[in-house]
Amino acid sequence: MRSVTTGQDRASDLALGLFGSCAIGVMAKSPRPGFSKTRLCPPLRPEHAARLSAAFLRDTTESVLTAAGVAPITGYAAYAPAGTEALLAPHLAPGTRQILADGAGPMPPGVDGFGRSLLHAIQGQFAQGHSAACVLSSDVPTLPSLLLAQAARSLLSGGPRRVVLGACDDGGYYLLG
């Protein structure tokens, strides 16, 4: 369940030197059989993989909204491809905003593949007026919301070159901010 941000929470944030808000975009695609969590098939059947994807999206976006109750965070689903908003919406926590992250448009040289979508998501969140932005894997439904609040506060309290990374044991990252 999402907590409610109080005026006292916001006053605390201002006292800590936190200005603005941090966007956290869960990288998402609509959970459809044959299109989501395909590396799990087999042993899962495509419809089971899609249901698992839907549950992960709901739980991960709920975690972002819970973190928003204790830190200046706005939750997004950074989705692709364009035109799938209506398919994605029922699988998100209520109040989660959507932002297109399909990697279309001009990109700096060397930004390819999924990196295009990550950069597009970050650019889109900054375009919404946020002071800081993160992208978050949809594969972390049990990530404590406290870690998201800490990441947001760290980004908002630093200078323009502040970075937050959530490293995975496999060498990848679950959070980039």
Enumerate the predicted regions with their spans.
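Short beta-strand/loop segment that forms part of the nucleotide-sugar
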Residues: 72-81
